[in-house]
Amino acid sequence: MNIKKIIAGLALSMLMGSGVANADWGDVYYCQMTNSLGITVEGEIERYKPEKFQFKLDQTKNAMVFGSTGMFKNEVFELVIGRTWPSQEAWNASDKYSMTYFEFGKFLFTRNGSLGITSLSANCDKF
């Protein structure tokens, strides 16, 4: 067997295995918003003070379950079946008015409603 194939195989196995043990159901994430803004129905842009928040990845509820403080106080975001890979630290959640995307510690959220649009980004760490 050629040395290049061995090295390529080892590198591939390390890459594939590196994220698998890093995340799973039951993990708790602590997040700090990097941007938070809204657009009113009149088209006015409003910038909000970035907040901290936390959530747990709950397998029983198939959801992101948020803590008791902050913008997402006690909210439950149901994960999208077929677009949820906790072991790879990547998932999507959505409902009638909002969409959430999470991958490798990056959190993106948008909500549309009768009062306008809310959009935010955050960096999250697992503890």
Language-model features: locations:
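Bacterial N-terminal signal peptides
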Residues: G9-G17
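Short, solvent-exposed loop/hinge segments that bridge or flank secondary-structure elements
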Residues: W25-A63, T100-F102
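Sec/Tat signal peptide C-region and signal peptidase I cleavage site
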Residues: G19-A23
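Contiguous, well-ordered beta-strand patches that form the walls/edges
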Residues: K61-T100
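Bacterial N-terminal signal peptides that target proteins for export
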Residues: M1-A8
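Short, exposed beta-strand-loop hairpins at the edges of beta-sheets
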Residues: M99-I117
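Edge beta-strand at a domain terminus
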Residues: G113-F127
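Short, solvent-exposed aromatic-acidic interface loops
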Residues: T34-G38, G67-N74, S114-L115
